[in-house]
UniProtKB/Swiss-Prot annotation:
Coiled coil: none annotated. It is found in: Cytoplasm. Its EC number is 5.3.1.14. Keywords: Cytoplasm, Isomerase, Manganese, Metal-binding, Rhamnose metabolism. GO terms for biological process: L-lyxose metabolic process; rhamnose catabolic process. Disulfide bonds: none annotated. The gene is rhaA. Binds 1 Mn(2+) ion per subunit. This is L-rhamnose isomerase. InterPro entries: L-rhamnose_isomerase (IPR050337), Rhamnose_isomerase (IPR009308), Xyl_isomerase-like_sf (IPR036237). Mn(2+) binds at H262, D294, D296. Belongs to the rhamnose isomerase family. Catalyzes the interconversion of L-rhamnose and L-rhamnulose. One of its GO terms (molecular function) is manganese ion binding.
Amino acid sequence: MTTHIHQAWELAKQRFAAVGVDAEAALNQLDRLPVSMHCWQGDDVAGFENPQGQLTGGIQATGNYPGKARNAEELRADLDQALRLIPGPKRLNLHAIYLESDTPVARNEIKPAHFANWVAWARERQLGLDFNPSCFSHPLSADGFTLSHPNPEIRQFWIEHCQASRRVSASFGEQLGTPSVMNIWIPDGMKDTPVDRLAPRRRLLAALDEVIREKLNPAHHIDAVESKLFGIGAESYTVGSNEFYLGYAASRQTALCLDAGHFHPTEVISDKISAAILYVPRLLLHVSRPVRWDSDHVVLLDDETQAIAGEIIRHDLFDRVHIGLDFFDASINRIAAWVIGTRNMKKALLRALLEPTAQLRQLELDGDYTARLALLEEQKSLPWQAVWEMYCERHDTPADAAWLSAVRHYEQHVLSTR
């Protein structure tokens, strides 16, 4: 054990104990909180179905940093490099377009076998897998509609894709012993003002009911639905709005996905967690960083990330909130993006676990808002970094920016050859 990390840890334990916080218990609790890393940061959401195809659906990956993964083997190798630099439990979140097959596979015909290599890889690394149907970057989504499409044949294609995706997801959970959270997001919407806002939503409602009709083992599979305010090319109307999906998740008792970038810039999902959790059994979070719009910048250790973590910890939502990341920055080293964003999410969770919440809650109940504010601010200066370094030490990962050297070495010897 590195001497200075050990010394700082011992002092930090004393400091936190003085305010009623057990730092050792915080580390144990942090090990109960896996963060689901998204595979699509590694290749700018290209996937393996048609890697040279255009990214559609109102989303954009900007930048052209060299070395992006070109196939599944490279993507898994890049993920391995990132995983080595992130302490604690992780999961991997896959989209349907990351299937592997020697021959073309229609999206409504995907099967668990097309993801067998991912399952074997995840099992070897003791990772859970999560899943998503890919309702974008496809000829049948080109006019901006999928599950709400007015053409019943096209709509049925996407229903079948989502049904097939659920079976893939359930196979993940069954094989790996941890439920796969499958999130449905669709890009459906209109660029300009529609006349009929209701009909597409009626179609979406019926389509979703058809998608989830087959009963799957909840120990293997969890359904989630995700709203969005707007996308590029769908600025005026989004079929799957927040109100639509909140109503759907509450009435069908699915999980609700809250994406940090899918609301108006003045809204934050940290404030929505405690409201939505009263009506739905589970929440899926897509922690991201919207800059003026749903830009999916790399997650920072900023106020909103900290507030999201605080809501999970303060309300003991360990088993009801699933933490996922969703960003894709093609302007920087993609492995570094994974490492920075995931470590920041875990740092935020640790800081929340080190908060003297019981004391702060009592001050609030007593109406002593002066002391509440004072202690909230003072606790920000407590030596949480020393606790983080101990956590990294125990998980055999770099405790500080030393991880960047490993990324640079990999970039020089692997990424630069692509």
